[in-house]
Amino acid sequence: GFLGTANIVAESGGTLGAVTYPMPDLAQRLETFFAMATERGLDADFHADETGDPSVATLRTIAKTVLKTGFDAPVTVGHCCSLAVQDESEADRTLDLVAEAGLNIVSLPLCNLYLQARDPGTTPRWRGVTLVHEMRKRGINVSFASDNTRDPFYAYGDLDMVEVLRESTRIAHLDHTKPHWFDAFCANPAKACGLSKSDLSVGSKADFIIFKARSMTEFLARPQSDRIVVREGKAIDRTLPDYAELDHLMTQTKEAQRMSA
């Protein structure tokens, strides 16, 4: 059961995660979840409200339960798509609770743009992106990520955060805003993961990427495939592996699917 799962997560030093769905006893289930996390000293992560159904609002229940229980370890919630199709007053109520509870939110524009409103033979009517601008105005720690990569949910992508930044700028209208959104791709995710913010000050780790661009428009206009990646002060080989070198990963996936069937 879930108790055994929580113990395994604790033994491996992981983060306790769950998917939330609307149900009558969700608040009670979440209280039990947070009690297990507290007893084991674990952070929490949720996959929530990845739907275009405005009646789905489990993010609000998560925030309320954090406030009720006083759970003080980091809590991260991904997707939260349904916020974008809810009545403005309802969404505002949820966002105020999220800010008060100090939740971290992760938006996944590429995958959610691809999956939401996907009905055969019809054109999608919305983008599937959560309310990132409204969150930032409230001081909520908002991050962006790629989510699925070349799997049954999203057959594309290459785990490239530059692609995520470039496409998220277009999808979520991150341009023409101040301050810039770079922190949502660097510092904010680090904060959500409990990592220290990196910088280029003397004594800091010399891990960074160099791009050929004189402005944001130049940076975003190209995929930056000629970037220079520096680790510990030295440029590393950035040659991408041939897809054939990755075939064993697909074989492992198929074998795992066969065994679980």
What residue ranges belong to the model's regions?
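Active-site microenvironment of metallo-dependent hydrolases
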Residues: 166, 179-261
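Glycine/Thr-rich phosphate-binding loops of Rossmann-like dinucleotide-binding domains
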Residues: 26, 85, 114-115, 219
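Short Asp/Glu-rich motifs
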Residues: 28, 55-56, 117-118, 154-155, ...
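Histidine/acidic residue-rich metal-binding segments in metalloenzymes
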Residues: 1-104, 121-144, 198
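Active-site proximal loops enriched in glycine and acidic residues that flank catalytic Cys/His/Asp
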Residues: 48-50, 79-81, 107-110, 144-148, ...
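Positions that flank functional sites
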Residues: 24, 52, 112-113, 150-151
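Active-site clefts of carbohydrate-active enzymes
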Residues: 104, 111-113, 117-118
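His/Asp/Glu-enriched, well-ordered alpha-helical/loop segment
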Residues: 43, 64-75, 115, 126-213
